[in-house]
Amino acid sequence: MTAQPTDRTTPLLLQGQEYVFRAPIAALDFQERVHRLDLVDPGDGEPEPCVLVLARSADMEMNDLSIALAEFGVRMARIDIDRCLDVSLTVYPDAPLIELDRWVLRPLLVWRRHFELAALPVDPGTLYGAYVADQWRSVADWITNRADWAQVNSLATGRQPDRMTQLTDAAMFGLRTPRTVVTTRPARHRPGGGACVVKTSGRHLVEPSSGVQHGLFPRPLDPRNGSGAPEPAPVLVQQYLHSDYELRVFVVGEQLIGYRVDKLDPAQLWVDPDAVEVRAVEVPPALGTTLLALTRFWRLDVAAFDLLMTDDVPVFLEVNINCDWRWFERRSAEPSGTDAAPVSLAVATWVAQRFAQLRQA
């Protein structure tokens, strides 16, 4: 019988977490829709070079990218994890070709992001659900690791740097990091000797059923719970550091795009986004050099770094590979009334240029 939490055993990061996001499931990809409606030239029957994206339907960054790549004349095809149960797909092991619906495609560049098995609209506790999830896991891993085509964020398709590896590597490259411990007994630890926060060792959003995401946001460690029971799963206990503001740095190829983020607590970005102030800033040159070096070390092409700025000293928190940028662009542009989208433009340009390089190879 599966154990269920009681009031006493509810994990710290599930206590008082009221943020729930319901991800819409709909075909919003521009290129997919115009191809289904036969609004484009069907071509001569030869395999069409393309960018293949494995995502989910609510990935608005990829919806925007589809439009931008169409303007560049680049074909983008897509498999969404939450809409894949009825997809017509054939992937050939002996040729770099796929048949997606009624199109024969030659992927040159593959980008996998937000393609989480938890978003599959099946019950993993049933035989059918376990079967479907296992098949898609195997095939998606194979597609994103094949040598027949290039990948965006090569390391992310294999061994993605976990939170602790990120902290270790960042310190190795000279960045300051908060003192951290991984434990099932958070009440027993005070890394740094003072106030601490408890963080998830995994994702910030957990999806117990397809399309329903619950927040797992950092929370202060209550010193009054010194004799607390063990957690059912390890968490991060991290030294609390006072900061002047947070810095989000998007890395796109060799380009750096920075945003200053002023918020009252870590969860505010999700639970009260209208109260968060965001503005574009220049990335300090020395910090930028270090972040680019880390990006190359991790073999990343598009990623976002989160840092605290404490007395003008950057403190590394994490790198986000499945990073979302539209909210930062929109929020920073609101005061001026502009529609500036520097990250979106940088990503679309980088993908189009990489596609052109691969096509000429």
Briefly describe each language-model feature range.
Residues 3-12, 16-18, 282, 296-297, ...:
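C-terminal active-site "lid" helix and adjoining low-complexity regulatory extension at the edge
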Residues 2-45:
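Short N-terminal or domain-adjacent regulatory/targeting segments
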Residues 159, 165-210:
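Loop-centered beta-sheet repeat module
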Residues 247, 300-311:
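A short glycine-rich, hydrophobically flanked beta-strand micro-motif that places a catalytic Asp/Glu
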Residues 69, 191-292:
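Phosphate-binding site of ATP-dependent enzymes
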